[in-house]
């Protein structure tokens, strides 16, 4: 190729190629700064983009898991609250039965104690029946178990129901006494019911702790997934900012180089003057 030619300006061609390359890099850096992402679409890096999208979907699905587990927590909390009420009522029922077992009582006092006992018994059934969260109960005998979401793959966390209604703790809606001797026998029956109720509540407490632990794990897992996606696609803005300044300087120099190269043709004309 001729070093001095008016048909082909090799220097200008090289300068233009370099300038175009710089402009392309500059556009990429500006896009990363504007979006905050180094991988904004599949054309930037298909493999990484696909991985990030899949991980983002998994992280987002964890919200449904957390919602389900939180419903589980609330369902158990309501049952435990009802259980506290029921154990308190059982304690009062034992007190009434013990007092009624006193053979020295007159009929009016005995009947008053029996009436109080029956009222306390009925309150137990009401407490168990109303122990619902969002229409769901694990305390009233309406279900044997509930399964909540445990992971994004649809696997479940199962909580076994614990019936703490009268039937669930060995009593009936007609459990009562009509004599001092029957009241004395009822004391043992109430003790057994109280033990049954506390055992069931302890089991629910264990399930609640398990839900709490798993919910904490799911939250940490979601945070880790979000961080992993960020590592894959987020731009290092400090690095990109420094690169932007460097490319802007390089662009200015490229424009000057192209201008100088374009002047070479004019220099050839001066040889013929």
UniProtKB/Swiss-Prot annotation:
The principal localisation class reads secreted
Classify the source by domain of life: Bacteria
Q: Which Gene3D superfamilies match?
A: f41 fragment of flagellin, N-terminal domain
Can you supply one Gene Ontology CC term for this chain's record? bacterial-type flagellum
Cite the InterPro entries for this sequence: Flagellin, Flagellin_C, Flagellin_N
According to its UniProt record, what is one Pfam family this protein matches?
A: Flagellin_C
Query: What GO MF terms are annotated?
Result: structural molecule activity
From the Swiss-Prot or TrEMBL record, state where the protein is found.
Answer: Secreted; Bacterial flagellum
UniProt keyword terms in alphabetical order: Bacterial flagellum, Secreted
Q: Which family does it belong to?
A: Belongs to the bacterial flagellin family.
User: What does the subunit section of this Swiss-Prot or TrEMBL entry state?
Assistant: In C.crescentus, the flagellar filament is composed of multiple flagellins of 29 kDa; 27 kDa and 25 kDa.
This chain's function reads: Flagellin is the subunit protein which polymerizes to form the filaments of bacterial flagella.
PANTHER family in the record, alphabetically? FLAGELLIN
- Name of the protein this chain belongs to: Flagellin FljK
């Amino acid at each position: 190729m001729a070093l001095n030619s008016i048909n082909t300006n090799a220097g200008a061609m090289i300068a233009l190629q370099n300038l175009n390359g710089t402009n392309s890099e500059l556009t990429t850096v500006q896009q990363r700064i504007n979006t905050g992402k180094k991988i904004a679409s599949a054309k930037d890096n298909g493999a990484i983009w696909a991985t990030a999208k899949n991980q983002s979907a998994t992280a987002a699905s964890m919200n449904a898991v957390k919602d389900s587990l939180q419903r589980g927590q609330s369902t158990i909390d309501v049952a435990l609250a009802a259980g506290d009420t029921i154990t308190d009522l059982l304690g009062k029922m034992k007190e009434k039965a013990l007092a009624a077992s006193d053979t020295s009582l007159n009929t009016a006092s005995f009947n008053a104690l029996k009436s109080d006992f029956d009222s306390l018994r009925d309150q137990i059934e009401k407490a168990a029946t109303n122990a619902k969260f969002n229409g769901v109960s694990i305390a009233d005998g309406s279900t044997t178990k509930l399964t909540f979401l445990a992971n994004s793959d649809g696997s479940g966390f199962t909580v076994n129901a614990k019936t703490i209604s009268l039937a669930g703790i060995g009593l009936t809606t007609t459990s009562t006494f009509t004599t001092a001797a029957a009241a004395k026998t009822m004391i043992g029956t109430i003790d057994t019911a109280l033990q049954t109720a506390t055992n069931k509540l302890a089991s629910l407490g264990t399930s609640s702790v398990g839900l709490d632990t798993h919910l904490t794990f799911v939250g940490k897992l979601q945070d880790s997934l979000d961080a992993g996606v960020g590592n894959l696609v987020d731009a290092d803005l400090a690095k990109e900012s420094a690169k932007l300044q460097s490319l802007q300087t390089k662009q200015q120099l490229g424009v000057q180089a192209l201008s100088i190269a374009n002047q070479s043709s004019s220099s050839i004309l001066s040889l013929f003057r």
